[in-house]
Amino acid sequence: MQKATYYDSSAIYSGYPYQSANGFSYDANQIQYPRTSHVESEYHRPACSLQSPGGSVALQKREMAAENCDRTTAVQAVQSKVHPESNQPQVPVSAPPPPPQSPGAISQTTSNGSNQPTAKNSSPTSASRGKQIFPWMKESRQATKQKSTSNTSSVESCPGDKSPPGSAASKRARTAYTSAQLVELEKEFHFNRYLCRPRRVEMANLLNLTERQIKIWFQNRRMKYKKDQKGAGMMPSPGGQSPRSPVGPGSTGAGGGGYLNSMHSLVNSVPFESQSPTSYNKPHQNAYGMATSYPPPLSSSHNNCPPTQKRYAGTDSATPEYDAHPLQGNGSYGTHMQGSPVYVGGGYIDSVPNSGSSVFGLTHLPHPPSANMDYNGAITMGNSQHHGVCDPTPTYTDLTSHYSQGRIQEAPKLTHL
């Protein structure tokens, strides 16, 4: 009703003789205003269209643009008389204005009604602008989250083997090799620890595996091999001997079972760094092939003798009991029996000037001439090697009854070592 009243009042005021023909206004507050044709051209002026999107914006800027809006009100009044039918369809569509408090408020209401198409045109722009800001930003954030999650999942899935055990989604399935595949892989690793690519392709086709699986298996197998080698290298050698010693760990089986292996004898004779003058080979029962060489003593300057006798029990009837025999020769006792255990016994080689062998005085010097070989070992040792400081009566039990002359022929086989 108020809207109709406003429009009726404008029609009443427009009934005064000063109308649009002269360009004067009906209101004392207004000055002259343009013609109707000019009003038609200025129908969409931007002066009040800035305030058209909402009534709240119009109220906020009412004081600033009062003159422009009043002028637009007068123009609308003239247009309402000239074109009454064009404004009537716009009345119910116009936004509800705030309650009138002054003629400025009335002019604001009329301006809202007159500039409704502009409001319609500008409101979609603001709505589209809002859609461009908030939903677009929200969608981009979701897309960013999706991209970040996809990137992280791809990064986690790329290492494969190195993925943490907790990430179940990106954890690579463990490859289960069959026994046939493992046999072929181990066989190939035995011959060649590093595979070339053609061979890897061939094995991949043969075992129905991928090249990557075979490559990774060989990498893991090489690491395991290195660990095994490192663990074996840290342990002492089986014989406890110098690396240049020709006597192997399996040589104890050829000698008598009562003879200690070289590692144990080394522990028992730590102060002594020499070989025993005797070595035994057991080709058959109780037959000992003894290859002993005793160069004549150069001097009798022996420092000490072992404090106790070392008893080494032979097999069956052969139980030799003898002490260590310090010799000051070249340190080569010629104990070169093939496959016989070496007794690292109690000779003192501290004062040996010309010993070119290792610290153990092992069998690296040339074999003494066969003229020094005496198979009657007890007599030779008793006559030429025992001195008054040591025990003068070493006992050799039943050794001279089983010497085999033919076993000494095996001795020169290892002299080149």
UniProtKB/Swiss-Prot annotation:
Compartment(s): Nucleus
* One GO BP annotation of this record: anterior/posterior pattern specification
Checking CDD domains in the record gives:
homeodomain
Query: Which residues does the annotated region (Disordered) include?
Result: 70-174, 229-256, 311-334
- Compositionally biased tracts (Polar residues): 104-129, 143-156
Kindly list the cysteine pairs connected by disulfide bridges: none
What SMART domains does this protein map onto?
A: HOX
Q: What is this protein called?
A: Homeobox protein Hox-A3a
Family designation: Belongs to the Antp homeobox family.
Q: Which InterPro entries match?
A: DUF4074, HD, HD_metazoa, Homeobox_Antennapedia_CS, Homeobox_CS, Homeodomain-like_sf
